[in-house]
Amino acid sequence: MISAALLWCLSAAAYAGNAVENPDSLALVNAEWNWKSIGKGGEAGSAKVKMFGSDQTISAVKYPAARFKTKILHCPGDESSTTDMLASRHGYTVGVNGSYFNMRTLEPCTFFAMNKSVISLTPKSEGFRTNGLLAFKKKNGREMEVLYCDSTKFDQYRKNYNMVIASGPVLIKDGDTGTFAQDKYFTEKRHPRTVVGQDAKGNYWFIVIDGRFPGVADGATIPETAAIARYFGLKDAINFDGGGSSTLWTEATGVINYPCDNKKYDHVGCRRVPNVIVAK
């Protein structure tokens, strides 16, 4: 039987096209991912890849949306904790950090609504990077949408979706790469990045690109992050909070990536966050 990981490699290789034209995509496909089952057809893997003229450490989880329940956990203020702790504490088997937040109050600072109630709104200062939404119509999270965010429609989003959170930028929408704000620090400088998205085969993907460890994990610009999502075969993808927040965890593997909040290249430098995307 061909494993799901091998099927991904074959499809990604086909998507990548000519090796001479696209060496970065083939470097991603040909890396040693060491995929591990997380149950119910889901897999987790991590690899060190030389691409974009840099050294990358990339971790990914993919799972069939129809066999998992996906949710956004809201744990602000004193309820906040690290991504791995929040996911495990609430009985989930997969977790990735969520959207932008106030690091002093540990409250979300982007539009966020659950169960028809608005939790927070996006201030104008966040508009340049928070141009998207991750939305789920059903409580079980089995219908994901990545949308461009219109701040005049927050009440409409609240009514139409069971869970919806603003983040960004949108990396890929319906197979098309997004247009990114020109910003030397956020967009054009390499940082740790977190990506949530879906492919055309019914799989949800959580991806973390580690950074701030030169020569091992250089991090990615926003255009490079979009390219990585595309190389994985995602048709829809959105960028979430990065930097020291970027954390990817599964019950089967523990923290997969190398969170940088402790400035050490290990698996324990996780930052407290107020919301996470989880699945079980």
Q: Positions of the model-derived regions?
A:
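Conserved beta-alpha junction segments in alpha/beta enzyme cores
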Residues: 50, 162, 169-201
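Short, solvent-exposed aromatic-acidic interface loops
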Residues: 75-80, 149-156, 209-214
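Bacterial Sec-dependent N-terminal signal peptides
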Residues: 1-19
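Short acidic-glycine loop/turn motifs at beta-strand connectors
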Residues: 64-66, 135-143, 173-175, 198-203, ...
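Structural recognition of the beta-strand scaffold that forms the well-ordered cores
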Residues: 93-97, 135, 197, 205-207, ...
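Conserved, well-ordered active-site substructure
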Residues: 105-128, 181-198, 206-236, 245-280
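Zymogen propeptides
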Residues: 15-139, 143-145
